[in-house]
């Protein structure tokens, strides 16, 4: 996420941990490296210099609290000041009235419609049943795109591609979904100079009387995100911001810091192309991940939202007891996939996230996908009892999956190593870092 920003900041933190004496020279070197990393991520230079000044001043003048080493104190200062740079407090989403009406705003191409789909999925996971109203009469494919998104998730949609009156659509949508807990209104993509659209937006605001107006901003535009946020705030009451496309953007840090500077809270961030690559923004957790400190709480929440509890319990029981089969291993892969891209999940594990490169993570994901294809060519008996798989079966499975026989053997080797590792953990009754490293190491080979 955010290009190489996380990787560069983690390297700086590691260097700081390895330094024996924390003096003025050390602090200045660390601050310079932080400056370099942030400027490369398109963070405004004035903001970077202000952050640097605060870190330097606190690091040189503050006495570490009792029981905290000078090194730990400097790391804490860097963490706290970077959290402040991104707005400090996590805004959260409180659905406290019925109907809770959300008005979506944004420029064309910002990812607004896709983000509506992601928010619907997020709300469904939290126990809400949202409905969507399409008032975008300017873009020909707007209704059709929303229809496809909402149909997949069984979210009710109101719209009429033949009706070119956005205000009429909004009124009818309100009537249609008056008993719904959450109603989301999609609007036409705007440009800050488009006076007709801005006027329409003001009238829509009067008709809908939204509980919250959310502005969607493309994270790849960097510092310009701040100007967008200001322009929209002047035209209407923007309650919060969603920043999209942060998974591969080298300018994402610039976008986030520029928006935070306007005072508009960042409520959600889009972290990938999948419908589940979307999370409530918490500056403290986010910076913790960027600095390589992990984010266990978000990892737990992701697991709770994504994983079938009964399946997970059964798989873990089999793993620990030594009854681990290829069925269990396939379930394990499905659970891993459901939590999102591997690089993103690893970034939440303290000390592990930035040890594994993007390339290695991608290779691992590709290897898992390959293993799943191979397993789909196996019979139920073979999946439940892999000991049955001898040379003749290996040949048949390889032909069915369209792979080399060596790839089938590679899968069986990984399975046997995993079974052996998990059986050993079951006997010892604990799961340590070495066990995790051994399992990850098998994939990274």
Curated annotation (Swiss-Prot):
Its EC number is 3.6.5.4. Its main location: cytoplasm. It comes from Methanobrevibacter smithii (strain ATCC 35061 / DSM 861 / OCM 144 / PS). The keyword Ribonucleoprotein applies. Part of the signal recognition particle protein translocation system, which is composed of SRP and FtsY. Archaeal SRP consists of a 7S RNA molecule of 300 nucleotides and two protein subunits: SRP54 and SRP19. It catalyses: GTP + H2O = GDP + phosphate + H(+). Composed of three domains: the N-terminal N domain, which is responsible for interactions with the ribosome, the central G domain, which binds GTP, and the C-terminal M domain, which binds the RNA and the signal sequence of the RNC. One of its GO terms (molecular function) is GTP binding. Gene3D superfamilies: P-loop containing nucleotide triphosphate hydrolases, Signal recognition particle SRP54, nucleotide-binding domain, Signal recognition particle, SRP54 subunit, M-domain. This is Signal recognition particle 54 kDa protein.
